[in-house]
């Protein structure tokens, strides 16, 4: 919005040519981060007071750890603060004609809406389970598939072909029609190695990355500050990849596919980092507010969508290794429990408690130890992911 305003003002008078500085993507990214940070810090106390007055407190499951019982009643749904800060800052500083930022915003707010309904049911109905899994997964799938279809259309080589005609062509090919090389699954650490994906493969991969990332971040959000800092670090790192893939010169030099327009995603990533830091100010132990599903589902979906656009799905799995391991710990725990119950008559557990962060708590780690150590691991994984920019 401000970019268009400065361009209009420059056209009015040559004396306003200094506003040309706002054409620089990096400057707008810094401003987006600062704007989101300030919005979050200023609005944070008011949002917390509002949530408290509405008695929107976090219900604690009956099987929760004893050390967590004191958190019952802590305001939740603080993710609205994060999403509001991101949305306002992004809309102010990005190029409104950029389709990639719009789709990321749409997916983020869509998954945020799912999380909002889930949190609201937990609070109003006093039901720690919230939305039933099938219902939640259904709506996640709807948004994930719509996003996947939009993205596969946006990267088609036949950009001048009408959408309906292109869709008919894909149907006739059984959705196996090849896509441009830049739409392939990029393999990190190898020079110009990518796995070609047809339309169907791209849609399935995109769907899995968005929905999987969303739920993985949600499962990680179980301790004060545990999820938000890794989201900040992974998001900032993806912003660097977006900047590279959106710059023809850098993309060519570093052997990345050039994706026109993806650089503007740096604005969103910067806003997400700023909003995340502001939220962490209130979410650090002992937390004054929790982000809830409205924040966790949305932020995870945002990371997944950005990774798909900049073709860094595997790198996302590396940098977000904590999210991956947390999700796998739950899947393995549930699978093993059901298998042993069917075979031996009683369920057995691989971990003392899932997700993994609770296992470490049960093993004697303090909450702050788990959180900070997971932060350190994420920082190292992000550095590994960033090395793929050059080590190819």
Swiss-Prot record:
Belongs to the glycosyltransferase 4 family. MraY subfamily. It comes from Acidovorax ebreus (strain TPSY). The keyword S-adenosyl-L-methionine does not apply. This is Phospho-N-acetylmuramoyl-pentapeptide-transferase. Catalyzes the initial step of the lipid cycle reactions in the biosynthesis of the cell wall peptidoglycan: transfers peptidoglycan precursor phospho-MurNAc-pentapeptide from UDP-MurNAc-pentapeptide onto the lipid carrier undecaprenyl phosphate, yielding undecaprenyl-pyrophosphoryl-MurNAc-pentapeptide, known as lipid I. GO terms for cellular component: plasma membrane. It is a multi-pass membrane protein. GO terms for biological process: cell division; cell wall organization; peptidoglycan biosynthetic process; regulation of cell shape. Pathway: Cell wall biogenesis; peptidoglycan biosynthesis. The chain crosses the membrane at residues 24-44, 76-96, 100-120, 137-157, 167-187, 193-213, 225-245, 262-282, 289-309, 314-334, 369-389. GO terms for molecular function: metal ion binding; phospho-N-acetylmuramoyl-pentapeptide-transferase activity; UDP-N-acetylmuramoyl-L-alanyl-D-glutamyl-meso-2,6-diaminopimelyl-D-alanyl-D-alanine:undecaprenyl-phosphate transferase activity. Its EC number is 2.7.8.13. Keywords: Cell cycle, Cell division, Cell inner membrane, Cell membrane, Cell shape, Cell wall biogenesis/degradation, Magnesium, Membrane, Metal-binding, Peptidoglycan synthesis, Transferase, Transmembrane, Transmembrane helix. It catalyses: UDP-N-acetyl-alpha-D-muramoyl-L-alanyl-gamma-D-glutamyl-meso-2,6-diaminopimeloyl-D-alanyl-D-alanine + di-trans,octa-cis-undecaprenyl phosphate = di-trans,octa-cis-undecaprenyl diphospho-N-acetyl-alpha-D-muramoyl-L-alanyl-D-glutamyl-meso-2,6-diaminopimeloyl-D-alanyl-D-alanine + UMP. It comes from the Bacteria. The keyword Metal-binding applies.
């Amino acid at each position: 919005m401000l970019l268009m305003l400065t361009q209009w003002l420059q056209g009015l008078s040559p004396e306003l040519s200094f506003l040309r500085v706002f054409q620089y993507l990096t400057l707008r990214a810094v401003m987006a981060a600062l704007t989101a940070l300030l919005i979050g810090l200023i609005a944070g106390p008011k949002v917390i007071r509002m949530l408290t007055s509405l008695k929107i407190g976090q219900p604690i499951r009956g099987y929760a750890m004893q050390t967590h019982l004191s958190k019952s009643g802590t305001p939740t749904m603080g993710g609205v603060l994060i999403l509001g800060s991101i949305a306002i800052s992004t809309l102010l500083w990005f190029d409104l004609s950029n389709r990639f930022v719009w789709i990321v915003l749409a997916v983020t707010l869509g998954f945020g809406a799912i999380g909002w309904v889930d949190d609201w049911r937990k609070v109003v109905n006093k039901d720690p389970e919230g939305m039933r899994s099938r219902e939640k997964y259904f709506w996640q799938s709807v948004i994930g598939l719509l996003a996947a279809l939009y993205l596969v259309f946006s990267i088609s080589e036949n950009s001048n072909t009408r959408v309906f005609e292109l869709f008919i062509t894909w149907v006739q090919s059984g959705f196996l029609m090849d896509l441009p090389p830049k739409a392939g699954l990029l393999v990190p650490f190898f020079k110009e190695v990518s796995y070609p994906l047809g339309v169907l493969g791209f849609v399935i991969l995109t769907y899995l990355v968005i929905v999987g990332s969303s739920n993985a971040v949600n499962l990680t959000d179980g301790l004060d500050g545990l999820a938000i800092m890794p989201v900040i670090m992974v998001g900032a790192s993806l912003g660097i990849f977006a900047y590279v893939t959106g710059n023809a010169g850098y993309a060519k030099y570093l052997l990345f596919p050039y994706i026109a327009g993806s650089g503007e995603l740096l604005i969103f990533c910067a806003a997400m980092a700023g909003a995340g830091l502001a939220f962490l100010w209130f979410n650090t132990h002992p937390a004054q507010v929790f982000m809830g599903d409205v924040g966790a589902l949305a932020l995870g979906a945002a990371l997944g969508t950005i990774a798909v656009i900049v073709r860094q799905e595997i790198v996302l799995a590396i940098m977000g290794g904590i999210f991956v391991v947390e999700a796998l710990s739950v899947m393995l725990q549930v699978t093993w429990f059901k298998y042993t119950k069917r075979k031996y008559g009683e369920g057995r557990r691989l971990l003392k408690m899932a997700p993994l962060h609770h296992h470490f708590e049960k093993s004697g780690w303090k909450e702050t130890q788990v959180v900070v150590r997971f932060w350190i691991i994420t920082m190292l994984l992000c550095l590994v992911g960033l090395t793929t920019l050059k080590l190819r």
